[in-house]
């Protein structure tokens, strides 16, 4: 007689995978740059969380571009929050401005003179926001920062 086992082979129980199953990749794509995970990226190399331009429907963009140009003064702007407010020259209610609607190389600061057009804020379109904002006169004796982080003036 041989010493072969007559017991059936041990089969591990079946387990369903945890749901949902996400493939793990060592990197993810951000625009045209590839960022390695866990590679010790310096904070200055990370992509900005702020969008560079907003996507609007053609009709909203066309209406804003065709509208009149208004003048005002920057009341407040927070680069970290990505928005601020403009006080219109005519003294009406302050108007919202988003970082993506600012033209030029400088971050607005309190007292900067600006020109802008207006666009309704969805979904109700009852309030307006400033678009195509251009700094026409920088506030005197105030340091200004460029979008790249360089401080200019004092």
From Swiss-Prot:
InterPro entries for the chain: Ca-reg_mRNA-binding_domain, CSD, CSD_CS, CSP_DNA-bd, NA-bd_OB-fold
Matching SMART domains: CSP
A Pfam family annotated for this UniProt entry: CSD
GO terms of biological process kind: mRNA processing
Gene: Csdc2
UniProt-annotated location(s): Nucleus; Cytoplasm
Region of interest called Disordered, as start-end residue ranges on this chain: 38-62
Keyword hit for Cytoplasm: yes
Keywords: Cytoplasm, mRNA processing, Nucleus, Phosphoprotein, RNA-binding
Principal subcellular localization: nucleus
Residues with PTM Phosphoserine: 19
The protein's name: Cold shock domain-containing protein C2
Keyword Acyltransferase: no
Residues passing through the membrane, by range: none
GO CC annotations, alphabetized: cytoplasm; nucleus
Start and end residues of each CSD domain: 69-136
Role description: RNA-binding factor which binds specifically to the very 3'-UTR ends of both histone H1 and H3.3 mRNAs, encompassing the polyadenylation signal. Might play a central role in the negative regulation of histone variant synthesis in the developing brain.
GO MF entries: RNA binding
Species this chain originates from: Mus musculus (Mouse)
């Amino acid at each position: 007689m041989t010493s072969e086992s007559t017991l059936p082979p041990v089969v591990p129980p079946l387990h369903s995978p945890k749901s949902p199953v996400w493939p793990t990749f060592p990197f993810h794509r951000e625009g045209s740059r590839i960022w390695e995970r866990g590679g010790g990226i310096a904070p200055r190399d990370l992509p900005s969380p702020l969008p560079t331009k907003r996507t609007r429907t053609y009709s909203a963009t066309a209406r804003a571009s065709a509208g009149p140009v208004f003048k005002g003064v920057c009341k407040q702007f927070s680069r970290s929050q990505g928005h601020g407010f403009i006080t219109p020259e005519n003294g009406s209610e302050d108007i919202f401005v988003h970082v993506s609607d600012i033209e030029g190389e400088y971050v607005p600061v309190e007292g900067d003179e600006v020109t802008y057009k207006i666009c309704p804020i969805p979904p109700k379109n009852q309030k307006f926001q400033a678009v195509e904002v251009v700094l026409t006169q920088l506030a005197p004796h105030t340091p200004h920062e460029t979008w790249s982080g360089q401080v200019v003036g004092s």
